């Protein structure tokens, strides 16, 4: 199925969608296309789109909200690279949950959340739903709550209900789990309270020079028709759902496929990476105070699409992004480029209300019809096995352990694993996993990895979102979009595939890419035919949606939530100030005036930050003498790091004073000290710095 022609909107400056009076230009631009008439906003669930008028905006009741969900910034294992030594030591950017609730007035409702974290897990999804139902009854449930991870690799982990992931963070982290769940629930509650008549619009823009295909040899195994869609191996399309209310843009959800692996595994300071920076910058330009997200006038969620084989490291080695060796600058550049992609051609929407189908599927044993397989023969998936190429990690982005000698297929693979497979792997497993050098049979040990996954299909005012727990490659995402568009009889332009939602199932490559056995193929855990299985599942959901019939939703499989031992690392005991000092006292600071542009560092007698994560208040601020705040611990100009020796903790705040006007500035540090009895005592310290 091919994309249909869509109306174009005039080129709009980026700030046109970023709040303030300029946002009126956005609605005017849509109106200028002649397509801004009212669509059919309240179709019954199951209604098709036949007979509705295509519009560039569709009426919909929408609410948006955001909340702080920052996890433990000291001593917590980070989630993404599986490097045990990568434990949090500071905070460059707070983590946020950004939620949108869509309601069609006819019983159709969807909550869509983007969370600044490495991976999403069933444990988080189900706990969020339990808490929402305690407040809202059955308004929110497994079928209408989508929680996606941004996939940053520099945020605390230890929040999975499956053992393998939590092993990489040396155990479960209850404090970070609670921070994550509480933040997501609060964001949805705020979005629910914000529900009001709005309009939604969809644009497709282009993101230039953000990402490179890190497994080009595998990509090139695909048929020419697939490769022709992505000449450089990357999907440059940026898809944005804009929310407009009373003539002003009040939020957006953007989908673009790129890995947030700008920061390598040696980096231990919490950051949202390129997607987190794009979201912060959009909101900052719109006047959002990130210490008070409850009052945010604009919410910008930069979600994932299908980035499985797309790296931000343009030199195809770690730390080779556009910042020329500066990881943070690379994240900023790539974030700005994604923000630049939020405008583009308006996509005509067929209108309609909200419709949804979801299904829990045991991925160990999906029977696949021949029409979905490369050779036309029926096939099956199998219990999860991770290959040697997975253990090698993506050698373009980092992770893995070189001393173990594992390699991706493009680098020769791992011959000794192949030899072991010949005698140790059952023929049935070998048939399913094919070219994979089978290393870790994680699916044969209960509780190690999630194997029953939920697949969601939602239609919101003509926009179709297919979400799943996997990391699809670029072409895998394309094939799923094609199948869904054909089954629903809608243009491909309105179909979005989003990974990292409601769980984690590792990768999905095409069967052709799988044969290469690069990292992505080694991490396609259910076998060579995982993509045909997922495509068949989505085809079934789409067919049911088009016909207006329900599906058997199935049920999640139990996990080990509450049974995985907590991590012993970074847990606060008692805090002790240095001899002769009080908590908050300045230990070191610049002597005399500093030139604008200087990185100003002030060290304080601190406390373990894990005792009090200071959500929506913050650990630091930089203020003018009149109290006007110029930066906080979400701002791009600041970073706070903690160094703990025995019971003493030093907190060092670094402020980039670039652009600061001459004058005096106060750098404030806030924390809470834990006493012998476990009680917390808040404290504050400050240092005045003169910028010459």
Q: Model-predicted segments: where are they?
A:
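N-terminal secretory signal peptides
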Residues: 1-12, 23-29
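Short alpha-helical segments used as structural interaction elements across diverse proteins
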Residues: 11-12, 34, 95, 478
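N-terminal export leaders
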Residues: 13-19, 480
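Non-catalytic substrate/cofactor recognition surfaces at enzyme active-site rims
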Residues: 51-692
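C-terminal region of N-terminal signal peptides and the immediate post-cleavage residues
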Residues: 30-53
């Amino acid at each position: 199925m091919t994309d249909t022609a869509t109306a174009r909107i005039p080129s709009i400056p980026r700030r046109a969608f970023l709040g303030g009076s300029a946002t009126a230009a956005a609605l005017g631009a849509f109106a200028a296309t002649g397509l801004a008439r009212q669509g059919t906003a309240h179709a019954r669930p199951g209604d098709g789109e036949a007979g509705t008028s295509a519009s560039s905006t569709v009426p919909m009741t929408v609410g948006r909200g955001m909340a702080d969900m920052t996890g433990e910034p000291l001593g917590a294992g980070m989630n993404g690279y599986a490097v045990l030594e990568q434990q949090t030591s500071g905070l460059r950017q707070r983590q946020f949950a950004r939620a949108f609730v869509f309601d069609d007035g006819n019983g159709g409702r969807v909550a869509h959340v983007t969370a600044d974290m490495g991976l999403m897990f069933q444990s988080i999804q189900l706990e969020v739903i339990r808490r929402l139902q305690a407040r809202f009854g059955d308004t929110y449930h497994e079928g209408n709550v989508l929680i996606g991870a941004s996939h940053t690799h520099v945020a605390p982990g230890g929040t999975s209900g499956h053992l393998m992931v939590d092993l990489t963070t040396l155990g479960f982290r209850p404090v970070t789990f609670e921070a994550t769940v509480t933040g997501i629930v609060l964001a949805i509650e705020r979005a629910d309270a914000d529900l009001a008549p709005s309009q939604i619009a969809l644009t497709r823009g282009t993101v230039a020079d953000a990402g490179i295909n890190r497994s080009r040899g595998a990509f090139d195994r695909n048929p020419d028709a697939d490769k022709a869609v992505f000449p450089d191996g990357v999907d440059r399309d940026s898809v944005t759902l804009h929310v407009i209310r009373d003539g002003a843009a009040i939020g957006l959800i953007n989908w673009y496929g790129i890995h947030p692996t700008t920061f390598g595994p040696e980096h231990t300071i919490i950051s949202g990476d390129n997607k987190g920076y794009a979201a912060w910058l959009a909101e900052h330009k719109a006047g959002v105070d990130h210490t008070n997200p409850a009052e945010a006038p604009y919410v910008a969620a930069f979600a994932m699409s299908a980035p499985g084989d797309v790296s931000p490291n343009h030199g195809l080695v770690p730390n080779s992004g556009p910042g020329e060796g500066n990881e943070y600058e690379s994240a900023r550049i790539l974030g700005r480029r994604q923000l630049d992609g939020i405008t583009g051609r308006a996509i005509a929407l067929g209108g309609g209300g909200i419709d949804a189908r979801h299904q829990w599927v045991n991925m160990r044993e999906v029977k696949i019809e021949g029409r979905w397989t490369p050779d036309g023969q029926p096939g099956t998936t199998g219990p999860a096995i991770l290959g040697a190429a997975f253990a090698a990690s993506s050698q373009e982005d980092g992770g893995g352990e070189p001393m173990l000698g594992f390699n991706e297929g493009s680098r020769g693979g791992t011959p000794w694993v192949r030899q072991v497979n010949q005698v140790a792997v059952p023929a049935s497993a070998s048939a399913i996993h094919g070219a994979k050098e089978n290393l870790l049979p994680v699916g044969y040990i209960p509780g190690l990895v999630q194997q029953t996954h939920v697949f969601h299909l939602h239609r919101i005012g003509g926009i179709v979102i297919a979400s799943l727990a996997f990391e699809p490659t670029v072409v895998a995402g394309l094939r799923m979009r094609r199948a869904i568009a054909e089954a629903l009889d809608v243009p491909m332009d309105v179909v979005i595939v989003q990974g990292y939602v409601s769980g984690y199932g590792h990768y999905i490559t095409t069967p052709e890419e799988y044969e290469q056995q690069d990292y992505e193929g080694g991490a396609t855990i259910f076998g060579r035919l995982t993509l045909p299985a997922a495509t068949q599942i989505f085809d079934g959901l789409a067919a049911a949606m088009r016909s207006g019939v329900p599906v058997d939703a199935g049920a999640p499989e139990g996990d080990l939530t509450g049974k995985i031992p907590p991590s012993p690392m970074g847990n606060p005991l008692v805090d002790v100030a240095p001899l002769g000092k009080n908590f908050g006292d300045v230990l070191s600071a610049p002597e005399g005036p500093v030139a604008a542009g200087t990185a100003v560092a002030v060290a304080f007698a601190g406390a373990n930050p894990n005792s009090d994560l200071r959500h929506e208040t913050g650990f630091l601020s930089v203020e003018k003498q009149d109290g006007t705040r110029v930066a906080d611990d979400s701002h791009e100009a600041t970073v706070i790091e903690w160094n703990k020796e025995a019971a003493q903790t030093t907190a060092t705040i670094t402020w980039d004073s670039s652009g600061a006007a001459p004058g005096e500035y106060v750098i404030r540090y806030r924390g809470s000290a834990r006493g012998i009895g476990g009680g917390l005592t808040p404290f504050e310290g400050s240092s005045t710095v003169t910028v010459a």
